[in-house]
């Protein structure tokens, strides 16, 4: 390969389409805007959601629900994920963060019962589902709510 043989990547050097520059270009005269009307004008076009005067969809549908400003977002950990730790390990939210099981703590860690745990672990978390608590204790481990 030599310097004079280098070519830009396919499609990376697209030529700008200059509209309104003669009929031979295929985009002359009306520049692809058609004849007259709101969309042909400078600054023309309708606002987002406008349906030509018909009551727009977002106004036809009823309002529903609300956003709870006190909502707590827990980092979810399933039992199947806990099997990666050695027998007898104390599993804490900090350890879960370090090992990359969870990306951030949010409002705490909640352990759910998806999968099965085969190791004896001491699990410390902010919340447990009742079935997850039973499964950990059945495997000989212990549960501690922080």
Swiss-Prot record:
It comes from the Bacteria. GO terms for molecular function: rRNA binding; structural constituent of ribosome. Binds to the 23S rRNA. The keyword RNA-binding applies. It comes from Bacillus cereus (strain ATCC 14579 / DSM 31 / CCUG 7414 / JCM 2152 / NBRC 15305 / NCIMB 9373 / NCTC 2599 / NRRL B-3711). This is Large ribosomal subunit protein uL15. InterPro entries: Ribosomal_uL15 (IPR030878), Ribosomal_uL15/eL18 (IPR021131), Ribosomal_uL15/eL18_sf (IPR036227), Ribosomal_uL15_bac-type (IPR005749), Ribosomal_uL15_CS (IPR001196). The gene is rplO. Residues 1-52 are annotated as: Disordered. NCBIfam families: rplO_bact (TIGR01071). Keywords: Ribonucleoprotein, Ribosomal protein, RNA-binding, rRNA-binding.
């Amino acid at each position: 390969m030599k310097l004079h043989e280098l070519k830009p990547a396919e499609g990376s050097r697209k030529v700008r389409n200059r509209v309104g520059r003669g009929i031979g270009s295929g985009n002359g005269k009306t520049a692809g805007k058609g004849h007259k009307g709101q969309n042909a004008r400078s600054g023309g076009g309708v606002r987002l959601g406008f349906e030509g005067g018909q009551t727009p969809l977002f106004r036809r549908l009823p309002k529903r629900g609300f956003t709870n400003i006190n909502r707590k977002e827990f980092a979810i950990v399933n039992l199947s994920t806990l099997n990666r730790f050695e027998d007898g390990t104390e599993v804490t939210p900090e350890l879960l963060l370090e090992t990359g099981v969870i990306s951030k703590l949010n409002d705490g860690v909640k352990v759910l019962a998806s999968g099965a745990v085969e190791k004896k672990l001491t699990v410390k978390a902010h919340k447990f589902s009742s079935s997850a608590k039973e499964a950990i204790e059945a495997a000989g481990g212990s549960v501690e709510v922080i």
